[in-house]
């Protein structure tokens, strides 16, 4: 544990916190509130979609566009440019890429493809979480933020082993941030 008490944490001149909890519990709402009061907000989901999954997402858009002859011709001649427009508030390109297993004729993807994409997401999530210490430094050095909030996303529990004291993700986060778990009732 990085701090022995809440008082010790509050006395620090700069704060770095990672919010954990299941999807929908309010992590992003809290992170946005803190951002509005002067904290640097790091969204793991945003980082996943813009840094580590962007190429997969855009390639999927292009695969779909290639099914339409009009768009296929424009893509092949470099006449159009297709990009994802992921924002903190709109992660739809990421969730759409991850897809839903089911009949491809009805908009689903095969279970094998679904598992492949879930593994890509898992790897991207781990890498995004391991980026946190570097972003704390960047938030301070580049932007002048003293306080840092990491919105970890709802699937943190799927990429860490809390029983392993040497889990690389938990070790990195606990050495650089205060871990705050939010629970719903």
Where are these regions (language model features)?
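Conserved phosphate-donor/acceptor-positioning beta-strand/loop module used by diverse small-molecule
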Residues: 151-152, 169-185
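Pre-Walker A adenine-sensing motif
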Residues: 1-11
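ATP-dependent small-molecule kinase phosphotransfer cores
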Residues: 58-162
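Conserved glycine(s) of the Walker
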Residues: 26
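The conserved Walker
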Residues: 23
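Hydrophobic anchor at the beta1->P-loop junction of P-loop NTPases
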Residues: 19
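Hydrophobic positions on the alpha1 helix immediately C-terminal to the Walker A/P-loop
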Residues: 29-30, 34
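Short beta-strand-centered segment that lines the nucleotide-binding/catalytic pocket of NTP-utilizing
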Residues: 38-53
């Amino acid at each position: 544990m990085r701090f022995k008490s809440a008082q010790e944490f509050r006395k620090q001149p700069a704060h770095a916190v990672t919010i954990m909890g299941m999807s929908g519990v309010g992590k992003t709402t809290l992170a946005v509130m803190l951002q509005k009061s002067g904290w640097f907000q790091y969204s793991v989901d945003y980082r996943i979609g813009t840094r580590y999954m962007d190429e997969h997402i855009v390639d999927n858009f292009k695969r779909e566009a290639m099914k339409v002859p009009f768009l296929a011709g424009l893509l092949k001649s470099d006449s159009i440019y297709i990009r994802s427009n992921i924002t903190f508030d709109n992660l739809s390109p990421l969730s759409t890429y991850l897809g839903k297993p089911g009949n491809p004729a009805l908009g689903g993807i095969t279970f094998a493809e679904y598992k492949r994409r879930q593994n890509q997401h898992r790897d991207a999530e781990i890498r995004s979480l391991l980026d946190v210490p570097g972003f704390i430094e960047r938030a301070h050095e580049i932007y002048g933020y003293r306080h840092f909030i990491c919105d970890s996303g709802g699937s943190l529990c799927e990429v860490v082993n809390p029983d392993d004291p040497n889990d690389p993700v938990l070790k990195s986060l606990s050495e650089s941030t205060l871990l705050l778990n939010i629970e719903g009732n």
